[in-house]
């Protein structure tokens, strides 16, 4: 199993409901279907949603939707866990999406994020210009953005540490990893706190 997939699975706690924003081919929906009563996968690609639908079959606990990633029809405080894996860097209105995620997550719910590490790309001298990567931030900037959106950072670490295969180094020297994994906790609304 790919290291990043295993790492994300290790951090996902059990809960009642999970939403996977930018679910792609549904790898995490498939892997996590036994841990949740309800799973929702959303992606902008109809092909990805169709493929995921074939993978999960007629499981009535799984809802797949093709649509934009910044407005959802779900009630407030509905989900226990949100996955946003390799998705936030593609979103034009990041602030609106994070506000919407905050709205649909219960207080104390976890959002697990993976994003490319722009700092590593600069340091390594490899300019990977991807026109679909709209948001290219350093790990510190990602954490500030999430905090501003009402999340508390529980954990951040590197994934795919390029030089040494040390898990300890990946946790401590996160700015050198090719990808950053962040676990953030949804804080209560300020007016309700």
Q: Which sequence ranges carry the predicted segments?
A:
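Short, glycine-/aromatic-enriched active-site segment of Class I SAM-dependent methyltransferases
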Residues: 114-134
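Short glycine-centered segments of the SAM/dcSAM-binding site in methyltransferase folds
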Residues: 17, 109-110
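Conserved N-terminal segment of class I S-adenosyl-L-methionine
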Residues: 1-75, 81-85, 98, 135-140, ...
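Short N-terminal helix/helix-N-cap motif within the alpha/beta-hydrolase-1
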Residues: 47, 92-96, 123
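Substrate-binding/catalytic lobe of Class I Rossmann-like enzymes that use SAM or dcSAM, i.e.
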Residues: 148-152
């Amino acid at each position: 199993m790919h290291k990043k997939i295993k790492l994300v699975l290790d951090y996902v706690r059990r809960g009642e409901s999970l939403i996977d924003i930018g679910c792609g081919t549904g790898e995490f929906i498939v892997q996590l279907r036994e841990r949740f009563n309800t799973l929702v996968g959303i992606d902008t690609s109809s092909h990805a949603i169709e493929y995921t639908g074939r993978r999960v079959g007629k499981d009535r606990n799984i809802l797949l939707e093709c649509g934009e990633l910044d407005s959802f029809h779900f009630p407030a405080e509905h989900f226990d866990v949100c996955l946003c894996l390799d998705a936030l860097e593609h979103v034009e209105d990041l602030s609106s999406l994070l506000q919407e995620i905050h709205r649909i997550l219960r207080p104390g719910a976890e959002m697990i994020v993976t994003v490319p590490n722009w700092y590593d790309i600069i340091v390594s001298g490899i300019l990977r210009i991807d026109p679909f990567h709209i948001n290219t931030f350093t790990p510190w900037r990602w954490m500030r953005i999430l905090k501003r959106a009402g999340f508390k950072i529980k954990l951040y670490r590197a994934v795919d540490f390029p030089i040494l295969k040390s898990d300890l180094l990946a946790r401590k020297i996160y700015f050198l990893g090719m990808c950053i994994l962040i676990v953030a906790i949804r804080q209560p609304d300020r007016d309700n706190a």
